[in-house]
Regions:
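Conserved ATP-dependent adenylate/AMP-binding module captured primarily in the ANL superfamily
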Residues: 5-22, 57-69
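Conserved AMP-binding loop of ANL adenylate-forming enzymes
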Residues: 9-41, 45-47
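Active-site glycine/GP-rich loop and adjacent strand/helix microenvironment
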Residues: 45-197
């Protein structure tokens, strides 16, 4: 748990989350690693956490309004839906304190990112993780948003040709393969993610 929370804390700090922030986590708590990993990492960073979980969107929006979190954590599609519900409820961006969105668990196009940022008036970033590796904290964007930064002290990424297994050069498109460097319980060697990057 220390390694996991450290990786997530670094990911959050790289986008500007501090111990002055309050984060609303709108991922489901349970066996899904997203909510718990982000919760632990935010606490390690010193940020306060509102563990809302998923669903009941009008209540989620009311909490955004009433409690004033500065960070929203969810899937991009749910963040977009929440912004639409907030608009329908008559809640405008100037009534919210949101400044950062940490989104993951699904892909996010630039078009969707722009809509979320406009819909909530926040700055958003993407992150990547897999339950097999540790969940969130494997990699994420920093405030520059020029690509994902891997936690290379804990994970060794490679890109391979998915048909031949040949390691490809930097910048080529292929399948992401990851070796864990610090996991003790279930270490993985050249784990084929089936994710194309």
């Amino acid at each position: 748990l220390d390694m996991w929370s450290d990786c997530v804390a670094r990911l959050c700090a790289a986008v500007g989350v501090t111990d002055d922030d309050v984060a609303q986590i709108s991922f489901g708590y349970g066996l899904f690693t997203g909510a718990l990993g982000l919760h632990y990492g935010l606490e390690k960073l010193g940020a306060a956490v509102i563990p809302v979980s998923s669903g009941n969107t009008e209540k989620q929006v009311k909490l955004l309004h009433d409690f004033g979190p500065t960070v929203l954590i969810s899937t991009p599609s749910y963040a977009m839906y929440m912004s639409e519900v907030a608009h329908d409820m008559g809640i405008s961006n100037d009534q919210l304190k949101l400044r950062i969105g940490l989104f993951g668990s699904e892909g996010c196009t630039n078009e969707l990112r722009d809509k979320i940022e406009k819909g909530f008036g926040l700055f958003s970033t993407d992150n990547y993780g897999m339950s097999e590796l540790c969940g969130p904290g494997v990699s994420g964007e920093c405030y520059l948003r020029e690509g994902l930064h891997f936690a290379e002290d804990h994970f060794l990424p490679e890109i391979i040709d998915s048909k031949t297994g040949e390691v490809l050069e930097r910048g080529e498109t292929g399948e992401l393969v990851v070796t864990t460097l610090s996991k003790e319980g279930i270490p993985l060697l050249r784990y084929r993610t089936k994710d194309i990057t």
